[in-house]
């Protein structure tokens, strides 16, 4: 089965969010399961620099000018690069300029990504041709539309990593992008008078997947559907919508081999985890005391991630003797509020604004609890990292958080299935109650260790997801 993943970023070549982690791990896992899998990416500077030995496969005239298709390998995965420097050779973010303004030609930049995927399906590389094109999020959504417009030269899968990002552009770009004018209607690309790259993926794909079973159900409801719920309900009725849970890349996230940690550890040697905690407390300027429960946040600072709830619940957490270590960036108001808390409580609150991959490992390896109180969370990877590292997740019951964390309720503690702390209502009171339950369990070290060891034993590796996707591809073909 020849499969082409189409996406805008891939860890560790280029990462702005969890999408990159998924694409950085899933193709390799599918290859390990016997798939013939490659990836198509725009040749952004970091991507091009990470694959310096790529060779030119083909050149082709497109709506964006004459572009090159290059091919190389990265850690055993074949990578196609779209060589169009006038579109992709820009510093910083692949999506916006240094003033955080989206590039005015993003419609062209990411339409080309979808168009080139279709050209590969039509035989642009005469030595390799995908049977399935697997597009990820809005950036690649037009791949499904171009395949439909060209007689379906390959089957298509579209994965929703986050429905909130829809890739909306003016309708007048439709003919410029070599799309059939008939595609711009309610049964196609049109979304409230604009062209939606996300809707293109949802409408034209042979099958839609969401990144967790719960999120696949949630997005058929108005509160999570962002206006797409009607289409998604129809795809659900047709059996063309399913949820496949993301996994953890064991080569990157494994506390027994993680070079970023002060001390490596596993479920049978948790004493070394305490060394990471003491190092983290010192690095964040907190009181260095192993007995204090250390809560952590590694997240974009947005209301979607529930960080305003963390602020509301923070006084109670501190009153109960807890500490908070936060790594993240985002909303300026939230950033300032957390920095103010760190200034007011320097021994209990440590804040680092920004995102540093290595430091995220040290926080997750050193903390006792990782908080993910999201209003919605398609899958979430942070809680999976927490489970793997014995850093108990405290999460809201939504999306992939609901699918991966089992609450420390008495019955779950009794049968050994508990792996973290789960709350339902989206408010600071519910979060505060979950924090209290974490504090109570912390005061019982024997029970805490029991839950830790179970959490670390749960397998969220990519092999299961890789097999599920390969089975889906087989059904489609």
Curated annotation (Swiss-Prot):
Function of the molecule: Synthesizes alpha-1,4-glucan chains using ADP-glucose.
Name of protein: Glycogen synthase
Keywords for this protein: Glycogen biosynthesis, Glycosyltransferase, Transferase
Top-rank taxon: Bacteria
Enzyme Commission number(s) from the entry: 2.4.1.21
NCBIfam families xrefs: glgA, PRK00654.1-2
One Gene Ontology cellular component: cytosol
UniProt record similarity statement: Belongs to the glycosyltransferase 1 family. Bacterial/plant glycogen synthase subfamily.
GO biological process, one term: glycogen biosynthetic process
Gene Ontology MF term list: alpha-1,4-glucan glucosyltransferase (ADP-glucose donor) activity; alpha-1,4-glucan glucosyltransferase (UDP-glucose donor) activity
Family annotation (InterPro entries): Glyco_trans_1 (IPR001296), GS/SS (IPR011835), Starch_synth_cat_dom (IPR013534)
Positions that bind ADP-alpha-D-glucose: 15
Pathway: Glycan biosynthesis; glycogen biosynthesis
Top-level class of the enzyme under EC nomenclature: transferase
Catalytic activity: [(1->4)-alpha-D-glucosyl](n) + ADP-alpha-D-glucose = [(1->4)-alpha-D-glucosyl](n+1) + ADP + H(+)
